[in-house]
């Protein structure tokens, strides 16, 4: 190899996956994580791969973009996806994890590789040599400034908001009922808090008028739709959230035998099901207001909070115009990975960490970089994030809106069309992987 040492900055999802993949390819890796010496507004621990928002890695359905991404990552050998499966908790058709167990599994994978050196402490200057910056959306101000000097231009900022987590033993199970949407009562992975029209309207009034924690520096920022605070959604219209996080479709309140006017779903945070998060209720309300407002929800009147919702600033670069097709800063030994690239989502962060490792390895052995088929979930996302023609770049999840249309001209239902996208993607990926044994097979010389 032309070089065999790499510094990875950031011990989140992208950085952890990247470090493990590099180590498995013979590199000496220095994995730098600023916590616990320096924390962030959203982190609660000093563990690697801490999940700071939801504990869900989204759908596993093969006809969904999120499910397709997981299938692609499995074929590409993602270690963190395997950790997620081993830490999974019941969540219907989604892959949700016990966040503590997940971090423990990732740390065990890192510790099992003696060529990874974990260094705790803030990185304030980008080191010499080959570097992968996976500092995440909560990149420290000092390092953010260094990144901006490196790529030129200004960072873009948006907000993420995390949902509250409650103690299940303090919930009123005579009111809450267990059911996943469209499934039999009592057999679902979610708890549901039903509201009638009067309860819903009172709750929305309280939610939209409650005191918020909004710092002056945060004002005027963009709220990313996928993690928008519930109170902001509710402000767009009195029924907006009833057609979103509080939609009652597919649910039946066993007390009435009818569909409730609205409902809040709660999803298990751990395998023991002692803690539940309020699905879709990321919030920036003050802690006191969160307690007051959520205690208005039937079944949650006496709920005790393991964690209140928080809101934090995210930073990402204008990737299409400052990075190349491998997420490298042209003319440097630096690559970016994870949400700092503007690819949004847990599995997307894992994926870009994997790609950073693969492309760094390809560079070291003098091989071509990874060029995933654009018909795939990850290939389409990379294309969007690195195409200079992309205008008004904003954070993006994998979604089928990024993939090229089917070419056979057949009319299909939405589900059949998505399944056809997935089938096409996996066929193309399998064919591509077969052409790259240097990166994905046993031949890594």
Model-derived features: where do they sit?
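Predominantly flavin-linked oxidoreductase catalytic cores and closely associated redox partners
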Residues: 112-268, 272, 276-287, 291-292
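Internal hydrophobic alpha-helix adjacent to the cofactor/substrate pocket in enzyme cavities
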Residues: 350-370
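C-terminal auxiliary extensions adjacent to catalytic cores
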Residues: 395-445
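Beta1/beta-strand and adjacent pyrophosphate-binding region of the FAD-binding site
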Residues: 2-14
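A short alpha-helix-loop-beta-strand transition element characteristic
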Residues: 62-66, 70, 78-91, 151-160, ...
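A glycine-rich dinucleotide-binding beta-alpha-beta segment and adjacent secondary-structure elements
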Residues: 278-343, 350-352, 370-388, 392-399, ...
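Feature captures the FAD/FMN-dependent oxidoreductase FAD-binding
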Residues: 72-146
């Amino acid at each position: 190899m032309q070089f065999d040492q790499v510094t990875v900055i950031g011990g989140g999802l992208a950085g952890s996956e990247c470090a493990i993949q590099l180590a498995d390819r013979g590199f000496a890796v220095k994995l730098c994580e600023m916590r616990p010496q320096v924390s962030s507004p959203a982190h609660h621990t000093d563990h690697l791969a801490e999940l700071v928002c939801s504990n869900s890695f989204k759908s596993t359905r093969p006809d969904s973009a999120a499910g397709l991404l997981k299938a692609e990552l499995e074929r590409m050998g993602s270690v963190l996806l395997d950790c997620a499966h081993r830490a999974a908790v019941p969540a219907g058709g989604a892959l949700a994890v016990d966040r503590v167990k997940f971090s423990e599994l990732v740390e065990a994978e890192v510790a099992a590789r003696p060529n990874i050196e974990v260094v705790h402490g803030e990185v304030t200057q980008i080191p010499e040599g080959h570097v992968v910056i996976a500092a995440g959306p909560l990149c420290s101000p000092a390092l953010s400034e260094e990144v901006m000097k490196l790529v030129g231009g200004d960072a873009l900022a948006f907000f993420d908001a995390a949902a509250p987590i409650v103690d299940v033993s303090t919930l009123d199970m005579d009111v809450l009922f267990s059911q996943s949407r469209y499934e039999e009562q009592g057999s679902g992975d979610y708890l549901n808090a039903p509201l009638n029209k009067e309860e819903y309207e009172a709750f929305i009034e309280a939610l939209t008028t409650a005191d918020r924690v909004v710092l002056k520096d945060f004002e005027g920022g963009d709220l990313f739709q996928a993690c928008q605070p519930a109170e902001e959604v509710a402000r767009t219209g009195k029924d907006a959230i009833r057609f979103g996080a509080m939609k009652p479709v597919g649910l039946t309140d066993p007390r009435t035998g009818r569909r409730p006017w609205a409902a809040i779903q709660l999803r298990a945070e751990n395998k023991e099901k002692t803690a539940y998060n309020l699905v879709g209720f990321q919030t920036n309300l003050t802690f006191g207001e969160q307690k007051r407002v959520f205690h208005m929800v039937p079944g949650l009147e006496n709920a005790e909070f393991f964690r209140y919702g928080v809101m934090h600033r995210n930073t990402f670069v204008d990737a299409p115009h400052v990075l190349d097709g491998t997420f490298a800063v042209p003319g440097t030994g630096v690559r970016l990975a994870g949400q700092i690239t503007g690819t949004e989502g847990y599995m997307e962060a894992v994926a870009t960490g994997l790609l950073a490792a693969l492309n760094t390895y390809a560079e070291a052995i003098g091989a071509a970089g990874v060029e995933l088929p654009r018909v795939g979930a990850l290939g389409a996302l990379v294309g969007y994030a690195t195409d200079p023609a992309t205008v008004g770049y904003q954070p993006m999840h994998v979604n089928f809106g990024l993939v090229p249309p089917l070419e056979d001209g057949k009319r299909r239902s939405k589900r059949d069309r998505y399944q056809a996208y997935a089938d096409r993607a996996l066929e193309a990926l399998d064919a591509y992987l077969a052409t790259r044994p240097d990166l994905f097979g046993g031949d890594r010389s």
